[in-house]
Amino acid sequence: MAQSGMTQEGPPGITRPVVFPPFKPDAPDCSRPAGLRKSLTFAQDNGRKFMQGVARGLELAAKDRGLTYEIDQANNDPAVMTAQVRKFVSSSGGALVISPVDSQSISPAIKQAIWSGAYVGAIVPPPATSLLNAPQYLTGKVLGDEAADYINTRLKGMAKVVLLTHDQLQFLAPRFAAIRDSLKEIPGVTIVADISPLTVDEAGGAATMRTVLLAEPDIDVVLGADTVVLGALAALRETGKARPDQFLGGIDGEPAAVAEIKSGGPYKASVSLASPIFAYAMGQHAADWLEGKNVPQAMDILPRSLTLQNIAGYEADVADPGSVYKDPVLRASYLRMYGNICFDSRENFVDFPWSSERK
């Protein structure tokens, strides 16, 4: 039996990995979900800047499409997030975008939302009506190759490297496999720490870096998600161990990382997964779903390395994601969409760890 106030059990979705064809935007319309609010809710794991970008993109899309918009932030608490998603279902919410704190514990509640007929867009882990991911190996390779080039050209092929990983989130593992692959080609590279911070935020990165510096005070390269690498930079500065010739590089294109790159200090690169742009697209898809239209089953946000040379154009794009979405050529430089699903075919929701890199 379903819990009180929740929908009944439904179909299991697609549980075995498949390769989705390209999205067909001209597919015939379906039924509109009945009895659901014209609402968009963002179930947010925490307040890091990357997720603030998601929130902004969703809010802009909701405004453009006439949806009410709500944010439920879980502050890294899986139980709180589960309660928030249950509340979404019991209040007949129309569309949910979620960045799960713990994908396993939240999965049953997300399925209830899917079975209710709502649009559910998930950022990386399943289940979801429409799943957002990045080509994770390529994302890591872009950063790893930038770091390797810097080590070879600026550090004479010698570097002590710290990798701040996300081992608790298996879907991101290919990022770090790619970074290791890029670095292993350089004989003079020593990875002195390969470790997951307890929390994926600046505080977690700073705490981990302080521990690393006790054993290895002279670090040349730090790589990971922007938010934890920014924390590592703070720890380097507070201990007097930051140097202009270091290479700190991250993934996510967070505003603080972009500002650090512009300043010309140790932070040299950020691989952008432009969160306002993919979030705006998810918000548009949510509105399309509620109007009985087809949406993608999966979508890639394509990685791009930010440099001093291209940051201005990138900042203009993320400031106005609506204009990016309306321009097919510009949109295709950021987003790639796969598969088709609508209210009538919602039993085909995604419940496997989808990646466009799976062949």
Task: Report each predicted region and the residues it spans.
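A residue-level marker of the well-folded mature domains of exported/periplasmic proteins
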Residues: M1-K359
